[in-house]
Amino acid sequence: MSTLLQHAQIDWDDQGRPHSRQYDDVYFAINEGIDETLHVFIEQNQLRQRFAELKPHDCLVIGETGFGTGMNFFCAWQLFAELAPAGARLHFVSVEKYPLSRDDLARAMQLWPELAAFTQPLLEQYVAIHPGFQQFSLDGGQVTLNLMIGDALEQLPQLDARIDAWFLDGFAPAKNPDMWTPELFTQLARLSRPGTTLGTFTTTGWVRRSLIEAGFTMKKVPGIGKKWEVMHGVYTGAAAAPAAPWYARPTDLPGPREALVIGAGLAGSATARSLAERGWQVSVLERHAGPAQEASGNPQGVLYLKLSAHGTTLSQMILSGFGYTRRWLEHLQRGQDWDACGVLQLAFDDQEAARQAKLAAAFDESLLQRLEHDQAEAVAGIALASGGLFYPEGGWVHPPALCQAQLGHPNVRLLNHHEVIELRKVDGQWQAWDGERLLASAPLVVLAGAADVRRFPACAELPLKRIRGQITRLPATEASRALRTVVCADGYVAPPRGDEHTLGASFDFHNDDLTPTTAEHQGNLGLLEDISTDLATRLGCAELDAEQLEGRAAFRCTSPDYLPIVGPVADVQAFNTTYAMLAKDARQVPDIACPWLDGLYVNSGHGSRGLITAPLSGELIAAWACGEPLPVPRAVAEACHPNRFALRRLIRGK
């Protein structure tokens, strides 16, 4: 899979229409574009009627080949907003090999002033668009857009979804034959269910025959404007085979949409928000006096992407999560809650320099840029020991502000001083107890308390590890305010938030005491010297008394493979019995349903990447729970799945 981003190369004609250089074709007709969209895609998929017939909590899923300027999406959203009942949702999934730059998208949107109420919200979030899955939450969560950036034949096989209606809107088959292949139509069939509809402007014979062969019943219908005929289709083939049972979707929960989330840090707050936006009434149980009191409580955390040049599942998760978090931060107050000041990772030795060279070759400059020594100093505003890799869209975040913002939804109720000691399942309800007192109950519960999820028997065998980390708070000086970006080596230092810089962070695998220590403050000052002796001088570090420094310590919670643990939870003993045959033959996939603990989910193990992976993991939990398209590639969802560890133990005979 390509990790290089290629934007659409566009020329604008004398009527203001965008014209693709890559495909030598126009994106839409200047006078008939919206009318064509309504006729070809809205009418052929009966969306007026289907939107009006939705019930509260129903979600209609549209799939599209070729996002282009987004016109089809905006027209569908406008109609959904007009016709759908309150509480219904629209989920729009689209693939685009050459996304428009933000400037080109804004220019195209000016051609449709009647759609401004829908184009502007997307434009405000149109940041950090990089290869892979990029999810947008719009209209208070009523509308979800999942853009898959890349070649359709690379992206669609990774999608886990059930599509209700298809918009086939690549450029004309003669101009863009790769978008009209039997292999692609096989993917459309895999993602469809019996009754899924399809609309397309092309009536080319081989396209029609290939769609019929894939399982669609196709019919030519009268067109509009210069298009004499268009096509309407219905999927009449068989439903796709389900995933391996240990990664299959749990059955829908009966009863009211009520949920408990245990823990109000980054993972819990994100999960609560994602469920609340889908109509769940969420009670967040937090043992402390307020949210973000543990690892999520640092004054500044860094939006830092530790990527691989080889497109690993972790790298894909980071890239998708980074984009989702950046779009969320657009709602917060820049300078106080976060700052997109960029992140500079120094090339502090030859090995790191070689790693950075590979990354610079693998990714687009909009994501990361290799800077020489003098360039790095110009970006940072201080003297440095080396150049490095600059992430212009990165920066720092005040994690408690993000948690508070995510909890600020009318469907979320925060219950502080509620420590859950035990979970009991009674009559389809998960009951949260603090000993003798019943705190709350609901059909769905999400454990989001970092390593403390292991106190519950269902998660006791998850291999979570706590790593103590301490940050140091340094008073800003007039000279230190020259620092313009986060700078990282083995540690990191951020530009000041208010009157303080944050410096960190130590790694201690053996200490369980959260009292800040002088030794670790001294260690952090040593990390600062490695980053920049100039900044250490500007901060007056030589005169600072380490015993008087302020800071805080907390536990990172990580897994052995450094991926978070996100998804539905199974009964481990029953799992081991049900799939015992895997110890003898790991290749077989028995047709035996997974013994889920219905309604129990976990969101943990984010390590030092919580700002990047936790918000998107909230969306992943909600997608599992609501039967929606997964916001990450299927392989990434499986790599994050709680069952991966029990599966490995069975296969390895441990």
Curated annotation (Swiss-Prot):
Record family assignment: In the N-terminal section; belongs to the methyltransferase superfamily. tRNA (mnm(5)s(2)U34)-methyltransferase family.
Region feature (FAD-dependent cmnm(5)s(2)U34 oxidoreductase): 262-654
InterPro entries, A to Z: FAD-dep_OxRdtase, FAD/NAD-bd_sf, MnmC-like_methylTransf, SAM-dependent_MTases_sf, tRNA_MAMT_biosynth_bifunc_MnmC, tRNA_MNMC2, tRNA_S-uridine_synth_MnmC_C
Biological process according to GO: methylation; tRNA wobble uridine modification
Gene Ontology terms, MF aspect: flavin adenine dinucleotide binding; oxidoreductase activity, acting on the CH-NH group of donors; tRNA (5-methylaminomethyl-2-thiouridylate)(34)-methyltransferase activity
Function: Catalyzes the last two steps in the biosynthesis of 5-methylaminomethyl-2-thiouridine (mnm(5)s(2)U) at the wobble position (U34) in tRNA. Catalyzes the FAD-dependent demodification of cmnm(5)s(2)U34 to nm(5)s(2)U34, followed by the transfer of a methyl group from S-adenosyl-L-methionine to nm(5)s(2)U34, to form mnm(5)s(2)U34.
Enzyme Commission number: 2.1.1.61, 1.5.-.-
A GO-annotated cellular component: cytoplasm
Disulfide bonds: none
HAMAP family cross-referenced by the UniProt entry: MnmC
Region (tRNA (mnm(5)s(2)U34)-methyltransferase): 1-236
Protein's name according to its UniProt entry: tRNA 5-methylaminomethyl-2-thiouridine biosynthesis bifunctional protein MnmC
